[in-house]
Amino acid sequence: MIAAMMVLGATSAFAGDSDALKAVLKAKTYADAKALVEQNLGSMANDAEKAKAYNYLVELSMKQFNDQQSIIQMNQITKKNDPVDMEAMNEGAYNALVAAQECYKYDQLPNAKGKIAPKYDNNAERVWNARIQLVSAGDDARTKNNTTLALKYWNAWFNSESSPLFNKIPAEKKAEPYKEQVAFLGAWLSKENKDMAQALKYCDVAMNSDEYKKQALNIKLEVLKGDLKTHEDSLKYINNLKDLYANDAKNEILLDNLNSMFASMRMDKEQLELLDNALAADPNNFVALADKGMYYIAKNDADNAIKNLKKALEIKPENGAVMVYLGACLNVKASNLQDPNGRKVVYQEAIKYLDKAKELDPEKKQYNWGYNRYQAYYGLYGPNDPKTKQAEADSQN
């Protein structure tokens, strides 16, 4: 009995590949092999067989990739122009990367003796160049307006960076100077494609670049904001903004967005506290001063609005939008004065700012100074003065 069990054990230990695995290894094309892997995976004897099956997919797809890459290399050497099947090359690169990660997953599992004895560690180096090819493949698809294909390749490249398959790749080899640029483009495409979770992943990487930080943050905020259909949606977005702002309190985009949300939700206490804290940290914070001026405009407090908007203009004296709001506040202040001489002085001051706004943007492309300027001229000169008539005409052009 014991002898029979020993024979049975030996037979099991040294058994060859299962029929399910043999079927995969007989396949001549990647498509056939992949279909058989998907069909027979559950019938394979163990995790080692599954790893071997996926490694075979790596071999087939890398051959497809390498065959086309060899043509490119020979063209460079011989100065020929033999045709290259870029579609086959790119698909080979993609399939090799996906299969290598699946192979790694099963290759790292304990065997029947409870030991981890990986056989395919070389796949990381083997598919690394194929992985890099997906950057160009995605960009080519993007320029051809094939968003789905671009994201297929870029997502595979981007998401695989953190794969344990590549843990042993040296850091200097992993350094990719184009990473933030591709991440920014990937964020934009993912947002357009309604894959918001992936867009946020891309944004977080793109924001590490000084060149793309501002644009990537705008995309991230747009994604986080969503449609804001309910009160709860708005509160969730506010909390997201708070978290971001807590980690980057000098970021004026976050400050302005959080201020706008507080204003839209009529959270006056929180809004004023936000702006006061920003100014306590930096009294010359232009956004905080401008937003505080707008806060007081909403509260019909012209004096405080004027005070803050003037301070904002001291920091950015060419900001026409602030000039228009300041001019409007001065008009309100002037109209409320009983003293004719006092009104005259304030209207003159309003005209100074509104004339400057007109000078900076004569065609009113960025801000509309027209009505406020006409109102100031009307208040100072009356309805029939030629200057008032001209200001009225300017406002209508």
Features from the language model and the residues they span:
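TPR alpha-solenoid repeat register
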Residues: 53, 166-170, 182, 215-216, ...
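Residue-level detector of the short coil/turn that links helix A to helix B
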Residues: 28, 145, 194, 228-232, ...
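Canonical tetratricopeptide repeat
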Residues: 56, 170-172, 178, 185-188, ...
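Short coil/linker segments at helix-helix boundaries
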Residues: 62-148, 152, 156, 160-181, ...
